[in-house]
Amino acid sequence: MEIGNCAEDIVKIQCKINHSNEIDNQVTSAIERLTNTGIRVLNQTVLLKGVNDHAATLAALSERLFDCAVTPYYLHLLDPVQGASHFDITSDHASQIYRELQNMLPGFLLPKLVREIPGKLSKTIIPTDV
């Protein structure tokens, strides 16, 4: 195997953009500088009540990210942290939003719906019963 030809050799950075309104010229310029050096940029979005809890909003975000050469990678349920419960969405509601999103986007623009469970080594995929 040649060095530099496998996925493990690609430098990856994960950003956290929750709404397409966050992507301005400064952000696109920074992403472009990263991708021009061969860095792959992935995005993790947190599903937030009142911010991005509609499939159309999330679809617009995925499309905008893709336009900037960013892969929409994870759609997180909110971690239970003090002072943020007003942003929380139930797993059932998140699954409903996700099913709508699946009907709006091609697979390569569809992030994985996940949650972090304390003590688990990796993210847990949320079933959507599709």
Each PLM stretch: what is its role?
Residues 1-104:
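Conserved AdoMet/S-adenosylmethionine-binding subsite of the radical SAM
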Residues 95-130:
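C-terminal accessory regions of radical SAM enzymes
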